[in-house]
Amino acid sequence: MNRVEPPYDLKEALIYTQKMAQLSKALWKSIEKDWQNWLKPYDLNINEHHILWIAYQLKGASISEIAKFGVMHVSTAFNFSKKLEERGYLKFSKRLNDKRNTYIQLTEEGENVFESLLEEFDPSRNAVFKGSQPIYHLFGKFPEVEELTCVIRHIYGEDFMEIFEKSLTNINNDFDSEDGRLKKKTDESAVHETAEELEPINS
């Protein structure tokens, strides 16, 4: 039986996948360190901050949505969400038209913490930002990473990318850059989707 040759060179495929793996690992090492340092004053870890981020964008996200868009196991999403609830940053709710699934929303305190983190973001402490400066100075913009975005889209799907792009749009709509810092826009000027009608769960 004749073996069908793949439409690519096997050695080329190995080199490409290893290049992606090793560069991604090196990049993540730097991202993880800077991300943790950013969160340290608030005593949050990366998973907790990611949950706050998704809850802010979706204005009522199910645990399965948190797991999917946060790229974490469902049990991880639930356990860290419970910890955030205990700290007063999240509340668990049910949708009036969906009693089966549990949804989470930011409390006022949780939203204040999330917004404070963004307002205190300092790009000079971010290695990826600093490492991209030569490209910015040469071309006048940061790398678009379109090819990487395409790869992620084919791995995680359109829903994942829609939330990713929506999160960037929301930050752009909700915040202004003033005097070298991010500032939350006033309610009149901010553009953000409202939450679906939810009812609280009694603990």
UniProtKB/Swiss-Prot annotation:
GO terms for biological process: negative regulation of DNA-templated transcription; response to stress; sporulation resulting in formation of a cellular spore. Keywords: DNA-binding, Repressor, Sporulation, Transcription, Transcription regulation. Residues 178-195 have a biased composition (Basic and acidic residues). GO terms for molecular function: DNA binding; DNA-binding transcription factor activity. Residues 178-203 are annotated as: Disordered. Residues 63-86 bind DNA. Signal peptide: none annotated. Residues 13-157 form the HTH marR-type domain. Homodimer. Negative regulator of protease production and sporulation. This is HTH-type transcriptional regulator Hpr. It comes from Bacillus velezensis (strain DSM 23117 / BGSC 10A6 / LMG 26770 / FZB42).
